[in-house]
Amino acid sequence: MESKPFTLPSQSATVLIGTQFGDEGKGKLVDYLSDQYDIVVRYQGGANAGHTICFDGKSVVLHLIPSGIFNEKCVCVIGNGVVIDPVALLEEIAKVEELGYTVKGRLFISHNAHLIMPYHKRLDALHESAQGGQKIGTTGRGIGPSYEDKFARKGIRVVDLLSPGLLQEKLRENLAEKNKLFRNIYEGDEIDVESMVREYEEFDKLMDPYITNTQLYLNRQLRQGKTVLLEGAQGCLLDVDHGTYPYVTSSSPTSGGACTGSGIAPNHIGKVIGVCKAYMTRVGNGAFPTELNDATGEMLGRVGHEFGATTGRKRRCGWIDLVAMRYSVAVNGITELALTKLDVLDGFEEIKVCNSYMLNGKEIRDFPTDHQTLSAVQPVYTTLKGWMASNAAARTFEGMCPEAREYVAFLERELEVPVTFISVGPGREETVFR
């Protein structure tokens, strides 16, 4: 009997990740690239991340729905690695529909994704306030407590909405435990079980059209030759395993997290695009070696409009850190870089780039992820000439001013990865591809 020929993986999936502390401008790139892909997948995080998309004179922030939703030919998937607040998701669906875009039939939600419950959000706020000076700087959206329940095997999943009896049972079990915490530890009010049961039974009807086995769906689509873009939230340096622990998020924004959070095998991935700002920002607490607590940092924040899309919090600003970037390139297997917000540097006569650190009198080029060591390093800078001109009209690399081109070339030489995308302004069209 003749053997059946093997079908090799298509490698038609691309992962797009943040290489820094999040807020790198991934939303613009996903929106721009979505017309080149059949499916866009969000694979981790929750409503704690905001992706801002600018088009047709509008600025839209999405927290859960993938940025590809604004391309009518693109299907969007919320993967099993995401934790979903049903209230936030339904509000977001309504917002997208109000803008005139079709959602039903174009958005699919993994039946294995976990739900963020009201008690998760309350626990998040109570726990953070109890930390005093040791606050992590969470968004208060219930992300951490939801992931805690997931890994403690107590979580409620999207699929549970489809079984009212099971949903009630799980809600009662969870609330019995959580109400003890509210009553005995935090000395607060309990959450009413019956009202929550009624509320979440309604979510079954509203979310049912979107729920499916997305792992099965995605693998079938890949076998049929469809292309997939996997969209990460936050950034590599906030990864729960590879980030600046404990000042991290509760999930895995890395390229490895793309596989576990979507159900797509690694051998389907052909490219890993790393998104980085031309400078650096961080929201919340945690070590930040190149942070600028001076007029330069204020200028970066003001020109770059550096306020969190989710919380509105002011972002901490500093020069780009290539020690951290080299680490991100290695951990994620990045094949190309997308450089965003280059226009924010237009008004600087000199631009500094951190190439190494000083630690206890020694120069180091490796990134320490433990908070204590990272807090002790001092950045060593290389100073480059600024360009003091706008590149907003440039649509080719050659059309950019020489100093801006040299800045990009310097990053490529140091990181040994090509920069294939350069954002020279917030608009969709203000983009240079190479």
UniProtKB/Swiss-Prot annotation:
Disulfide bonds: none
The protein's name: Adenylosuccinate synthetase
CDD domains, A to Z: AdSS
Major site of localization recorded for this protein: cytoplasm
PROSITE patterns assigned to the protein according to its UniProt record, in alphabetical order: ADENYLOSUCCIN_SYN_1 (PS01266), ADENYLOSUCCIN_SYN_2 (PS00513)
Lineage, uppermost ranks: Bacteria, Pseudomonadati, Chlorobiota, Chlorobiia, Chlorobiales
Originating gene: purA
Protein EC: 6.3.4.4
Assembly notes: Homodimer.
GO molecular function: adenylosuccinate synthase activity; GTP binding; magnesium ion binding
Organism: Chlorobium luteolum (strain DSM 273 / BCRC 81028 / 2530)
Pfam families: Adenylsucc_synt
Pathway in which the depicted protein is active: Purine metabolism; AMP biosynthesis via de novo pathway; AMP from IMP: step 1/2
GO cellular component: cytoplasm
Keyword Disulfide bond among record annotations: no
Free-text comment on the cofactor: Binds 1 Mg(2+) ion per subunit.
Binding site for substrate: 309-315
Key words of the record: Cytoplasm, GTP-binding, Ligase, Magnesium, Metal-binding, Nucleotide-binding, Purine biosynthesis
Catalytic activity: IMP + L-aspartate + GTP = N(6)-(1,2-dicarboxyethyl)-AMP + GDP + phosphate + 2 H(+)
